[in-house]
């Protein structure tokens, strides 16, 4: 393996970091905007509170609110994104603190707007939408649906103030990135450093079993030392969610969270149920193939991320990735390729691994500015899939920003991972077409399973099942502790993986690794999105002109429900057919892996 040490942020190459000057040229400009929006917030409250009584006033209020929200959105990203890459920088922390002050002012003074919209007469709203804002039809439909769950203006203001305060997620991030210190470990006579970033991106997928397992032992030893702190943070978070659900009249915290993300309980339950029964057998076969080829008799959870063919890894530089992505995603059209070029030319992506940087990857798009992407580049080809994934988010929300107003700039969470996962499948299909070598083909398919499907349909799905069971325990007032959380996680893992592996000691603490548990019911949306993404990518593979249909869907933002968006894309998720087809596709890929491996072993 390649030994790696994390370096301080000030030692990374600037050309591979994201450019915050796309938002504000200087900190002084940022601070001036903070002062300006503070005044604008107070003026908005003074001008419109209690006065949304006629269509003309409501129209000007909505437009002004959208202007404020767009600037607030820029401010939030200028504050939060540097924290994700350099959280030990005092200036970065100070800028975040300044934004948190404005966030409190925003929440305390503008909560009236949502409350007064909900209180408007339904016919008044319909006439307003028809005559003034037909583009916000679905937005106001959701407003009407919220009526029975909306509290008094005073209560909503208290909740808004409370929600604006730094919460349990902040505590989780501090514990994870600032307090945890990992012991180095020895393997094969060498000493290796360990950290969250190093384990997640390097050691956990090392092809040397001794390195991999010693790293896991070191990693989980540290997690175990903080399990009670992390459990307290997480349990407090879900108790807060249960409290809000009860206040708003929901019997189940799951229904409350689904409503908040424009979700559908039937689709949610089907996703949770079907993947356990139908996908698990395919994944077990894949893991057994890994064990067979690596001659591992006691396959463990810590071994799941190894490559099927460890001697066949494709190296990839950051600069080379640009050409690959333009060719692979070129099927999506000229505008898509232009966006890829822009993302490199204008430094949308933060590539380096450094001390104080968050783990994982994400894309945070500021409409009409940039899709800021966080990665931890490892120099391997599989990072191209990660970047393709995040560029899918970037194009989606840049397109939404171009075609929709700020109130339609969101996206139903059930659909949000479709554009990103679709890109991963498109890249795989491109690679399979351009290189027919048997060993390369096996590498691509193996990567599809281990990166695209295992990550999105297994890792995040197991998070979702765990969440589902914990939330149901909260609904039933059952006691939760660190040990209870760990037992539930272990039970979920053992049920899914069956006899294909042993859940090694410490792996039950996997619930401490992901931030998604502080984001409502986000984890299940990965498998939901990949269900849609698989269908769309294969449609485009069969008929490249279908890309135009897909790009049109990506311009709709939150102006439609997830069901309607998927239907417009030609993938009707109101039935279980797309999910069943996606699972069958995974089974087909596993069959291909067995066939190709047997052919290569002859």
Cite the ranges covered by each PLM segment.
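His/Asp/Glu-rich acidic catalytic environments and adjacent acidic regulatory segments
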Residues: 1-50, 74-262, 270, 274, ...
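C-terminal, non-catalytic "cap/extension" segments appended to globular domains
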Residues: 10-12, 25, 113-118, 138-150, ...
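Glycine- and acidic
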Residues: 20, 204-219, 256-272, 304-313, ...
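Hydrophobic alpha-helical scaffolding
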Residues: 23, 158-161, 205, 212, ...
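Active-site-proximal, well-structured secondary-structure segments within enzyme catalytic domains
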Residues: 132-136, 184-198, 228, 232-376, ...
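Active-site recognition of the HExxH zinc-binding catalytic motif
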Residues: 249, 378-398, 420, 425, ...
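Conserved helix-loop functional segments at active or binding sites
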Residues: 327-338, 361-364, 393, 397-405, ...
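Post-HExxH zinc-binding segment in Zn-dependent metallohydrolases
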Residues: 411-440, 449-451, 455, 529
């Amino acid at each position: 393996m390649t030994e790696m040490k994390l370096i301080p942020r000030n030692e990374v190459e600037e050309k591979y970091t994201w450019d915050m000057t796309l938002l504000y040229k200087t900190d002084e400009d940022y601070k001036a905007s903070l002062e300006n929006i503070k005044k604008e917030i107070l003026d908005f409250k003074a001008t419109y509170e209690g006065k949304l009584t006629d269509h003309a006033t409501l129209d000007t209020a909505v437009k002004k609110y959208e202007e404020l929200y767009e600037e607030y959105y820029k401010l939030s990203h200028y504050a939060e994104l540097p924290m994700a890459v350099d959280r030990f920088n005092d200036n970065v922390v100070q800028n975040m603190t300044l934004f948190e002050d404005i966030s409190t002012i925003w929440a305390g003074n503008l909560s009236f707007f949502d409350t007064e919209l909900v209180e408007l007469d339904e016919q008044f709203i319909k006439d307003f939408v028809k005559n003034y804002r037909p583009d916000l039809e679905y937005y106001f439909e959701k407003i009407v649906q919220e009526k029975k769950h909306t509290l008094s203006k005073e209560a909503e203001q208290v909740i808004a103030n409370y929600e604006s305060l730094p919460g349990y997620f902040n505590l989780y991030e501090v514990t994870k990135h600032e307090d945890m210190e990992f012991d180095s470990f020895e393997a094969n006579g060498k000493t290796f450093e360990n950290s969250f970033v190093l384990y997640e991106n390097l050691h956990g997928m090392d092809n040397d079993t001794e390195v991999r397992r010693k790293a896991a032992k070191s990693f989980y030893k540290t997690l175990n030392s903080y399990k009670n702190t992390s459990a307290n943070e997480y349990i407090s978070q879900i108790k807060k969610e249960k409290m809000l659900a009860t206040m708003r009249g929901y019997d189940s915290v799951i229904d409350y969270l689904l409503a908040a993300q424009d979700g559908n309980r039937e689709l949610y339950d089907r996703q949770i149920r079907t993947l356990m029964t139908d996908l698990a057998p395919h994944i077990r076969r894949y893991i057994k193939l890994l064990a067979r080829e690596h001659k591992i008799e006691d396959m463990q959870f810590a071994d799941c991320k190894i490559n099927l063919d460890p001697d066949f890894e494709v190296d990839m530089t950051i600069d080379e990735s640009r050409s690959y992505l333009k060719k692979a995603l070129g099927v999506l059209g000229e505008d898509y390729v232009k966006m890829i070029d822009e993302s490199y030319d204008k430094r949308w992506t933060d590539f380096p691994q450094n001390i104080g940087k968050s783990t994982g990857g994400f894309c945070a798009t500021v409409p009409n500015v940039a899709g800021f992407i966080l990665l931890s580049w490892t120099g391997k080809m599989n990072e191209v899939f990660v970047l393709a994934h995040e560029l899918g988010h970037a194009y989606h929300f840049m397109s939404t920003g171009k075609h929709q107003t700020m109130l339609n700039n969101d996206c139903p969470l059930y659909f949000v991972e479709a554009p990103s996962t679709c890109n991963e499948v498109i890249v795989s299909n491109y690679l399979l077409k351009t290189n027919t070598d048997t060993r390369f083909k096996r590498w691509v398919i193996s990567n599809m399973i281990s990166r695209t499907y295992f990550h999105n349909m297994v890792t995040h799905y197991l998070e979702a099942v765990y969440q589902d069971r914990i939330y149901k325990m909260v609904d039933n007032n059952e006691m939760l502790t660190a040990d209870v959380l760990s037992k539930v996680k272990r039970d979920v893992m053992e049920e899914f993986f069956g006899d294909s592996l042993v859940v090694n000691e410490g792996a039950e603490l996997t619930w401490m690794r992901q931030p998604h548990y502080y984001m409502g019911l986000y984890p299940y949306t990965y498998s939901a999105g990949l269900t849609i993404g698989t269908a769309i990518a294969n449609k485009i593979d069969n008929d490249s002109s279908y890309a135009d249909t897909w790009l049109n869907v990506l311009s709709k933002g939150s102006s439609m429900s997830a069901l309607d968006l998927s239907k417009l894309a030609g993938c009707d998720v109101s039935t279980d057919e797309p999910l069943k087809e996606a699972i069958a596709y995974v089974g087909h890929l596993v069959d291909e892996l067995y066939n190709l491996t047997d052919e290569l072993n002859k």
